[in-house]
């Protein structure tokens, strides 16, 4: 609910468990085989996107600014032409669908499962420019793996991801590119841009008893 002429957002208090917690309980109680099925069901729930909100991915200046903050994607930049170097090579490797809005932090730990349904509780990093859908799903799987890898029987990260080819292509070049994009995103969030972001959007907060 918006108040104060749209300057204040008030959210209801929600009770439940995160999807990560519920998946962790399944992993602990039933093992990795049951976990794979549960993860698939959770991914299908999160990424059930209406067809009209999907479109082909295309590289944009905004995409480069966020995901190439470290310059690791420069090797995919095309040679200079009379119109300037383009990113067709990068777009070819990342060829995928994208959504009209991409919540980069659509992680299992950011999905609260309540009696009334599942709610996204962290949407600070929602981008309105095209982002490869596979990369967003990759982050969901990778962050779950990193949290629970001690319970996954010694599986390597890519081995774990390889169990879900319907969400993330098991392609070494693509996965390496996703890793570079993740490092670029972290630099964008926590590097020099973080100070600017905080200064631009800093607001006073008040805790209500």
Predicted features along the sequence, with ranges:
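Conserved structural core of kinase catalytic domains
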Residues: 2-85
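Hydrophobic transmembrane helix bundles of membrane-integrated enzymes that assemble
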Residues: 83-87, 111, 117, 158-163
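Hydrophobic transmembrane alpha-helix bundles
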Residues: 33-42, 95-99, 190-200
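Short, Lys/Arg-enriched charge-dense amphipathic segments
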Residues: 19-27, 75-91, 101-105, 112, ...
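Short, exposed beta-strand/loop patches in secreted or surface proteins that constitute
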Residues: 1-2, 111
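Helical subdomain adjoining the active site within ATP-dependent kinase catalytic cores
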Residues: 129-139, 144-209
């Amino acid at each position: 609910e918006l108040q104060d002429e749209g300057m204040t957002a008030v959210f209801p208090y929600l009770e439940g468990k995160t999807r990560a917690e519920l998946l962790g309980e399944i992993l602990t109680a039933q093992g990795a085989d049951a976990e794979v099925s549960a993860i698939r069901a959770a991914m299908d729930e999160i990424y059930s996107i209406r067809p009209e909100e999907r479109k082909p991915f295309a590289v944009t200046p905004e995409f480069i600014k966020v995901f190439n903050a470290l310059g690791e994607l420069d090797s995919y930049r095309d040679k200079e032409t009379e119109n300037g170097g383009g990113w067709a090579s990068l777009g070819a490797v990342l060829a995928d669908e994208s959504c009209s809005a991409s919540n980069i932090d659509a992680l299992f730990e950011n999905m609260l499962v309540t009696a009334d349904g599942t709610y996204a509780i962290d949407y600070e990093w929602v981008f309105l420019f095209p982002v490869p859908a596979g990369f967003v799903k990759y982050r969901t799987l990778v962050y779950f793996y990193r949290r629970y890898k001690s319970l996954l029987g010694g599986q390597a990260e890519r081995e774990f991801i390889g169990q879900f080819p319907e969400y993330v292509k098991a392609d070494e070049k693509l996965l390496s590119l996703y890793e570079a994009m993740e490092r670029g995103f972290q630099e964008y969030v926590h590097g020099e841009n973080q100070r600017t972001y905080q200064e631009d959007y800093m607001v006073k907060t008040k805790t209500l008893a």
